[in-house]
């Protein structure tokens, strides 16, 4: 599974475990040398060490690398020695490299800094890899969410006093058009997962009314799907695996674009949206961006980044509306770009809105409801 999800990723590969473990002794020696010259030494082992204590530090780290992060945190509570050992930055950097491609979602509060893994350990001497891992991993985020139910209940109650209208979401992006399996068609034909709630009467010129669905058979929400061009042009581009001309956006000049992944900044066209889409942006409560996450294709992420920024422009509506990014592939077993890498490529950390990147596939709609639930929570509806 790891090799499948990590294909196309610079932080993954079938030889990752072997490479890290083969070099752990050399890296550990360098780190210990730096520690002796820059800070206090870790506390000595207990006076009557168990067999595990008598092993070389490199062997201890190798054994610890086989444990789960939860087990490590529990081991750190045994005594001062193990508390220091389980905080070893090399160990937690290894966990980040190993587990990050497998995470199915990441949000604006948990995205790890790309510099954590792109720079050497000595360059990141001040970084707390353990804290970065525990902040980013889905299990920790789930525990944090479950520990704040009162706030969610209060905001949901207050919102119900103000408005009863179903939330409206604008959905756009290349994943709607480039995949061999149509996400929208699957949504329309999955009544057990997404029951249809009808077509609203509120029309938007040139766009229509969108389609309403039930979430958990209780909460209604409306999706306005924004395609880049006509069906014929989209199909032609999909068959040729090329990008169709996007007629939702109008070039406005040039803007500095962060190169990402260590590349230097470059000049790129900035965009505005056409009048019909501008009307949509003023009315919706949030956005769904469907990214093509198939690793086999080439993607112009910098262009996508500029288009996302144009769509969520604060001048077109209330600030802070949530953005759900669906990292979508056609089939569940396809090689995909991990959601953390996709978030970095789209430069989502530069946005001033709450966002979530969620793995999904068009065939089974896996992850779609989790993303909708997140939007409802951000809007105070749950």
Language model: regions and residue ranges:
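Switch I (effector-binding) loop of TRAFAC-class P-loop GTPase G-domains
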Residues: 188-238
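Eukaryotic intrinsically disordered and solvent-exposed regulatory patches
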Residues: 47-50, 68-69, 144, 154-159, ...
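Charged, amphipathic alpha-helical linker segments immediately N-terminal to NTP-binding catalytic cores
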Residues: 95-145
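CRL adaptor-proximal regions
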Residues: 1-54, 99, 107, 112
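Inter-motif core of Ras-like GTPase G domains
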Residues: 240-264, 270-295
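Conserved GTP-binding G-domain of TRAFAC-class P-loop NTPases and closely related GTPase folds
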Residues: 283-382
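Conserved G1/Walker A P-loop phosphate-binding module
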Residues: 142, 152-197
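Short hydrophobic alpha-helical "box" of cullin-RING ligase substrate receptors
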Residues: 51-68, 72-86, 92, 96
